[in-house]
Amino acid sequence: MTLKDYDLELFNAIQREDNRQKEHIELIASENFVSDAVLEAQGSILTNKYAEGYPNKRYYGGCEFVDQVEILAQDRLKQIFNAKFVNVQPHSGSQANAAVYQALLSPGDRVLGMDLNAGGHLTHGYKLSFSGHYYEAHAYGVSRFDERIDYEEVLKIAIEVKPKMIIAGASAYPRVIDFKKFREIADTVGAYLFVDMAHIAGLVACGLHPSPLPYADVVTSTTHKTLRGPRGGIILTNDASIAKKIDRAVFPGQQGGPLMHIIAAKAVAFKEALDPNFKVYQTQVIKNAKALSDTFKSLGYKLISDGTDNHLILVDVKSKLGITGRDAEDALYKANITINKNQLPFDQEKPMLTSGIRLGTPAMTTKGFKENEFIKVAQLIDEVLSNINNEEVINKVKKEVLKLMKDVK
């Protein structure tokens, strides 16, 4: 029996989401559209199989074929990032990060990560996250002068704090991160260097952002976002002793049975990332972000760090228009443009209001948008934000969005 026949209520909810994805311009930087092959693997009968443990070391019988699946994912991931040891089992990026903490630290140990307001992530030491609850978390930020990481300041804080682990990586930082400098800082204070490359993994895979692997003790990522795979996490290292600790921290430390259907989908995405066309795609992602950035600047908006090196931009809507990020998000959604409000460095607004918005290009680049389309998108966004209480203007923009979306993949 089909889902439609058995559960029409759920089927209709999925169909409505399908329509939303087809009719909205998707600019959330952490989202993307997976291939049909990834979807096929994710919806496969592998969801039926329990496989606690690792290939050739399972706690259940009948795992010979899921072993093949996981080994494929491991081998492809190693090839992409030139890593000696990988773990493809984490259910999410946050669980991958939690496994790193468990593997390398004890509760109460000091960590130094990027402040959430400056572009960091909840798992980098935020007080309401496990990372700030079980560990003594300290933070570095960005310079007030250029809104970029001030590595001298990071060093100064590290010397003062003496963390056991330093975390590099971000969820809202539009510039290249210098992992070599972070390695030097970590070595100065005798700390582990942990890099969370979730947002930039696809760029790193193609050599469009420096790789953290030569410098970090351990690296994590999500498999969605720029990697364009299923929702999930991965962990990579070149250190054999750390790899053993990581494996124990993932299973049985953080998780029980792995999601074999998701691991299969990861394997598909990793094969796609090894295809030469993937670099063409990632190159276009960056070109599109620069087109978006340049257009917003020409329209008089302040951009955090004055631009971008990667797949995202942070736009200050408060300084130009006097509106909050939430105002912007709500108005744009009425026009079928999906974005997220985002705190900016040194933001005076509350986290649920914010002074800015975060825009990313990966999803619509997958749909075939290039520079001209993103220039148009920036203009449409400006039209809405300059008229957030004008329903006539918003409806006009919505019609233009629907017209644009009719021509995409």
Swiss-Prot record:
<protein>
    <recommendedName>
        <fullName>Serine hydroxymethyltransferase</fullName>
        <ecNumber>2.1.2.1</ecNumber>
    </recommendedName>
</protein>
<keyword id="KW-0028">Amino-acid biosynthesis</keyword>
<feature type="binding site">
    <location>
        <position position="116"/>
    </location>
    <ligand>
        <name>(6S)-5,6,7,8-tetrahydrofolate</name>
    </ligand>
</feature>
<dbReference type="GO" id="GO:0004372">
    <property type="term" value="F:glycine hydroxymethyltransferase activity"/>
</dbReference>
<dbReference type="GO" id="GO:0005829">
    <property type="term" value="C:cytosol"/>
</dbReference>
<comment type="function">
    <text>Catalyzes the reversible interconversion of serine and glycine with tetrahydrofolate (THF) serving as the one-carbon carrier. This reaction serves as the major source of one-carbon groups required for the biosynthesis of purines, thymidylate, methionine, and other important biomolecules. Also exhibits THF-independent aldolase activity toward beta-hydroxyamino acids, producing glycine and aldehydes, via a retro-aldol mechanism.</text>
</comment>
<dbReference type="GO" id="GO:0030170">
    <property type="term" value="F:pyridoxal phosphate binding"/>
</dbReference>
<dbReference type="InterPro" id="IPR039429">
    <property type="entry name" value="SHMT-like_dom"/>
</dbReference>
<keyword id="KW-0963">Cytoplasm</keyword>
<dbReference type="InterPro" id="IPR019798">
    <property type="entry name" value="Ser_HO-MeTrfase_PLP_BS"/>
</dbReference>
<feature type="modified residue" description="N6-(pyridoxal phosphate)lysine">
    <location>
        <position position="225"/>
    </location>
</feature>
<dbReference type="GO" id="GO:0035999">
    <property type="term" value="P:tetrahydrofolate interconversion"/>
</dbReference>
<dbReference type="Pfam" id="PF00464">
    <property type="entry name" value="SHMT"/>
</dbReference>
<feature type="binding site">
    <location>
        <begin position="120"/>
        <end position="122"/>
    </location>
    <ligand>
        <name>(6S)-5,6,7,8-tetrahydrofolate</name>
    </ligand>
</feature>
<comment type="subunit">
    <text>Homodimer.</text>
</comment>
<dbReference type="InterPro" id="IPR015421">
    <property type="entry name" value="PyrdxlP-dep_Trfase_major"/>
</dbReference>
<feature type="site" description="Plays an important role in substrate specificity">
    <location>
        <position position="224"/>
    </location>
</feature>
<keyword id="KW-0663">Pyridoxal phosphate</keyword>
<keyword id="KW-0808">Transferase</keyword>
<comment type="pathway">
    <text>Amino-acid biosynthesis; glycine biosynthesis; glycine from L-serine: step 1/1.</text>
</comment>
<comment type="similarity">
    <text>Belongs to the SHMT family.</text>
</comment>
<dbReference type="InterPro" id="IPR015422">
    <property type="entry name" value="PyrdxlP-dep_Trfase_small"/>
</dbReference>
<dbReference type="GO" id="GO:0019264">
    <property type="term" value="P:glycine biosynthetic process from serine"/>
</dbReference>
<comment type="pathway">
    <text>One-carbon metabolism; tetrahydrofolate interconversion.</text>
</comment>
<dbReference type="InterPro" id="IPR049943">
    <property type="entry name" value="Ser_HO-MeTrfase-like"/>
</dbReference>
<dbReference type="InterPro" id="IPR015424">
    <property type="entry name" value="PyrdxlP-dep_Trfase"/>
</dbReference>
<dbReference type="InterPro" id="IPR001085">
    <property type="entry name" value="Ser_HO-MeTrfase"/>
</dbReference>
<keyword id="KW-0554">One-carbon metabolism</keyword>
